[in-house]
Each structure stands twice: as C-alpha cells, then as structure tokens.
Design a protein with these regions (language model features):
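Conserved beta-strand signature within the Rossmann-like core of class I S-adenosyl-L-methionine
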Residues: 126-133
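Conserved class I S-adenosyl-L-methionine
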Residues: 1-34, 37-45
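Core SAM-dependent methyltransferase catalytic element
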Residues: 172-206
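A short, conserved alpha-helix within the catalytic core of class I
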Residues: 110-122
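Conserved SAM/SAH-binding beta-strand->alpha-helix loop
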Residues: 66-68
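A short acidic, Gly/Pro-enriched loop at the edge of an enzyme's catalytic core
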Residues: 94-103
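Conserved SAM-binding strand-loop segment of SAM-dependent methyltransferases
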Residues: 80-91
Length: 206
C-alpha cells in the first residue's frame, strides 16, 4: 500500500486542482435514481462525484488511497456547503461494510476482487452506478489506460452484475468532457423482494 499511496499522492500534488470540475455525466443524467440514505464513492479522488451526491442529500463515504486527493475532496465539500466522510484506504484490501449502503458508485476504477464486496455492501434494493474503461483502447484510437488488468472486456459489467436488475447499460466510445472515451456504464439494482419498489424505480428510468 505504501508505494501506491506515495505514487498517487505525488500524482495529485503534481496536478492542478480544479474545484469547478463537473461530476460524471451518468450521475447528472440519472440523479432521479438516487435513493435516500448512505452512499459510498469508491476511488473518490478529489471528490467531484462524492460532493455531488452530498449535495443531493446523501450521507457520503469517500474512499481513496490518496490522502492528498481526499484533502482536496474535503476542501471542495466545504466550498459547496456540504459534508463528506473521507477514508484513506488501499482499495485492494478495503472491507466494505455489509448491508450498509443505499448507493455505491465506482467511476474509472476496476478491481474485480471488490465486486463481491460491493454486492454485499448494498442494502436490498440498493443501487450500483459503475463506469470505467474498456479493453482495446488503442483499437478505438485512444491511448489510455492500457493495462488490461484494469480494463473491462466487452459486456463484462453485465456479467459481473447478472444477478442484479439492470436499469441502464451502455458500452462504446463516447465524447464527454471534451474528450473521447471508450467506456462501459451500468446502473443496476440489488434485487429487492418487494417488487413494487423495483417497478417504481423502473418508471424513474423510463
């Protein structure tokens, strides 16, 4: 963990902080799907998504390996008049509390070992919003990232969450934030035994 922490802290120190950065497009588009309650932002970075969730009334835990990034996240939260709880942790070993969160988001970070923890960490009826890069970036004319360990195979997100109710899925090259990205995006619900709640959520998607 120590080497990764140092590497990411240095990366953030060398980068300029942009407090006006926008949250992820999928979050903004599907804000109506946000439940009430607790949210977890995995690999939260400088907090753009965590703060957006807090602005919509969620109690947010923002987890990242970089203390520098999370300091910036707290600064952003204060500037926006909200609170988030920051947790410095190695996500390779982070134990997500079971049956605890109403919403979990994971953007631009892939560790397949975390998937079971994400599923267990969501309450019944809870929502996962997941978006990260696809394998074969160069075949799309893109050059980052390149390590296949951290890239999704085609339809992999659908397979990983096949036991959830899929509310939204897309996969391909999309232009967002002024750049082209080869990504997969998924919103899914941990199946709730009360079908009326799931039907209500479906109507919100449509």
């Amino acid at each position: 963990m120590r080497e990764d922490l140092k590497r990411w802290d240095e990366k953030y120190r060398e980068s300029e902080f942009h407090p006006d950065q926008e949250p992820s497009t999928i979050l903004k588009k599907y804000v109506r799907l946000f439940p009430k309650g607790r949210a977890l932002d995995i690999a939260a970075g400088e907090g753009r998504n965590a703060v957006f969730l807090a602005e919509h009334g969620l109690a947010v835990d923002a987890v990242d390996i970089s203390r520098v990034a999370l300091n910036r996240a707290r600064k952003l939260a204060r500037a926006r008049g909200v609170r988030i709880r920051t947790i410095v942790a190695d996500l390779d070993r982070y134990p997500i509390p079971g049956d605890f969160y109403d919403l979990i988001i994971d953007f631009n970070f892939l560790d397949r070992r975390l998937i079971s923890g994400i599923k267990k960490g969501l309450k019944s009826g809870g929502i996962i919003m997941f978006e990260t890069y696809l394998a074969g970036q160069r075949s799309f004319g893109l050059d980052r990232p390149s390590n296949p360990k951290y890239l999704l195979e085609p339809n992999e997100l659908l397979r990983l969450f096949r036991d959830f109710r899929i509310l939204f899925f897309r996969e391909g090259v999309f232009k967002e934030g002024g750049s082209r990205r080869a990504i997969a995006s998924l919103i899914a619900q941990k199946i709730d035994p009360r079908p009326e709640l799931s039907e209500e959520l479906k109507r919100k998607v449509l």
